[in-house]
């Protein structure tokens, strides 16, 4: 796998803004919009991910709503494979399957079109999102993909928030790659 140098990691980290007390007091939010509006940093990141994934025989990239759409669609275009959105309930127009998952206080749910990976038997899918914290959404997405005729062969995150332990939980289900760990 193509690894970044510490200097390259520091460069990407320098383009991500920390916002204190968002969305609630005590939280430090990793704002990726500053990376997205830095064309050099975004192109560097996408070129890096293309090097990592271009020869892995992946059939589809699935991105988790909403920031996973940004990275997933850009990477899919760069390595010339289809992109599949994983969405919140009632956002997809055709027949869907869904997966519920636990939150700190309650439950949430994600959906995918029932035929999202049609045309490729035993499709190999890369799951992508901007960051992983507790891993609840990512675990649900892996389960959702695996409910179809496909297999999630790897999950990729721009940022792994190590203290929350989500990457370790998802690693029990599929291979993990995080560009940055904080």
From Swiss-Prot:
Q: Which Pfam families match?
A: Pribosyltran
What's a BP term from Gene Ontology annotated to this protein?
A: AMP salvage
What is the enzyme's class at the highest EC level? transferase
UniProt keyword terms in alphabetical order: Cytoplasm, Glycosyltransferase, Purine salvage, Transferase
GO CC annotations? cytoplasm
Q: Which PANTHER family match?
A: ADENINE PHOSPHORIBOSYLTRANSFERASE
NCBIfam families xrefs: apt, PRK02304.1-3, PRK02304.1-5
Please give the name of this protein: Adenine phosphoribosyltransferase
This protein's species is Campylobacter hominis (strain ATCC BAA-381 / DSM 21671 / CCUG 45161 / LMG 19568 / NCTC 13146 / CH001A)
């Amino acid at each position: 796998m193509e690894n970044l140098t510490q200097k390259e990691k520091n460069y990407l980290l320098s383009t991500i803004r920390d916002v204190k007390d968002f969305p609630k007091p005590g939280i430090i939010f990793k704002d990726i919009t500053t990376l997205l509006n830095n064309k050099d940093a975004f192109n560097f990141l996408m070129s890096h991910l293309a090097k990592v994934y271009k020869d892995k025989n992946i059939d589809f990239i699935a991105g988790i709503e909403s920031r996973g759409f940004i990275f997933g669609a850009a990477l899919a275009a760069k390595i010339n494979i289809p992109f599949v959105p994983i969405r919140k309930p009632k956002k997809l127009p055709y027949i869907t399957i869904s997966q519920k998952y636990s939150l700190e206080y309650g439950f949430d749910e994600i959906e995918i079109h029932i035929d999202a990976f049609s045309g490729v038997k035993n499709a190999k899918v890369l799951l992508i999102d901007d960051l992983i914290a507790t891993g609840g959404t990512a675990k649900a997405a892996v389960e959702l993909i695996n409910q179809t005729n496909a297999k999630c062969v790897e999950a990729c995150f721009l940022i792994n928030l190590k203290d929350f332990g989500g990457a370790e939980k998802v690693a029990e289900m599929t291979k993990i790659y995080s560009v940055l760990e904080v």
